[in-house]
Amino acid sequence: MLRWITAGESHGPALVAMLEGMVAGVEVTSEDISTQLARRRLGYGRGARMKFEADKVTIVGGVRHGRTLGGPIAVEVGNTEWPKWETIMSADPVDAELLADQARNAPLTRPRPGHADYSGMLKYGFDDARPVLERASARETAARVAAATFARSFLRQVFGVEVLSHVISIGASDPYVGPEPTASDLAAIDASPVRAFDKAAEESMIAEIEAAKRDGDTLGGVVEVVIHGLPVGLGSFISGADRLDARLASALMGIQAIKGVEVGDGFETARRRGSQAHDEMRPGPDGILRSTNRAGGLEGGMTNGEALRVRAAMKPISTVPRALATVDMSTGEEAVAIHQRSDVCAVPAAGVVAEAMVALVVAQAALEKFGGDSVAETTANYERYASGVAARLAR
């Protein structure tokens, strides 16, 4: 089974991603990972930290000469800002006198509404929010994006598919309504300042960000992830835990600041009658055809051959320049929340992180379905299955 885990803190020496269960022969280089991490840094409305918090990638194990070996994979994403934080974030004990002179070591006792600060301090018994925010930070997603680079390559090699995303809306901007983008549109989407597929939508989103910036505020939005060309039958209806839509929802909700997920037309489907909610089928020259894709490529917890389409709603960033009211946990008195460097809007980057989680989950489901110890073996298993499906549909 494909499994992943990350370790590290926002201002620690590095983030580490571990990926276990990936087959041998997946083609990935350090440059490939760096490319995906650079995409994660895209987006109008990002803070100044994006300019100097570079991602230095080191593949520690599981890869030789650009191909996976079949064993556990470890990737380190170094923090170029580490020298500034080495004393504050040292894993070993530090003399109190050294810490006293460090402005960065000032206790953070005023939790930010909407952040993990308050609950984390109480749950783990911390007097300071620093240990909470260091791990809860969205910086951790860099490690997930690194791990997902292997899943993306696996899906490309076995199925010939690409994972892509685009921003549907930011703040109160009019949501994009139109055709789903394809892999050939990805470069144009990444070239957009807000990773929008539509120029008019892009202008509306930028205007929203500019207004929020002037007001000392932050914005959330909605992103959509799309994969064209997946085979029928990834996932299962056998149990709730096996349903691919449930697994995708869990993975997307596990991204920092994501507060809602929908598959296909999702919540809008609940407003329709059944005759207008489902995707009718008809015979075609090469199999079953659908006139719509309201289900987002998933029925009964399984892929149905249509484009996989899922959306995630991101709340506004909780580090608000116009600091929100809170309580100082050291005194119990009214206060304003702590404010550190932050973005006005990170929705474009959230799309790249959402791609990563979808890639990991879909690759996991693909390996469960087709097995194998190498790309060649998994591909052969898939092609045999695909031939059988095609033969059934040709009857």
UniProtKB/Swiss-Prot annotation:
EC number(s) recorded for this UniProt protein: 4.2.3.5
Gene3D superfamilies associated with the record: Chorismate synthase AroC (3.60.150.10)
Cofactor info, note text: Reduced FMN (FMNH(2)).
Compositional bias (Basic and acidic residues): 272-283
Region (Disordered): 272-296
Gene Ontology CC: cytosol
Pathway noted in the entry: Metabolic intermediate biosynthesis; chorismate biosynthesis; chorismate from D-erythrose 4-phosphate and phosphoenolpyruvate: step 7/7
Biological processes annotated in GO: amino acid biosynthetic process; aromatic amino acid family biosynthetic process; chorismate biosynthetic process
Similarity section: Belongs to the chorismate synthase family.
Assembly: Homotetramer.
Protein's job: This reaction introduces a second double bond into the aromatic ring system.
Protein's name according to its UniProt entry: Chorismate synthase
Biological source species: Rhodococcus jostii (strain RHA1)
Lineage: Bacteria, Bacillati, Actinomycetota, Actinomycetes, Mycobacteriales
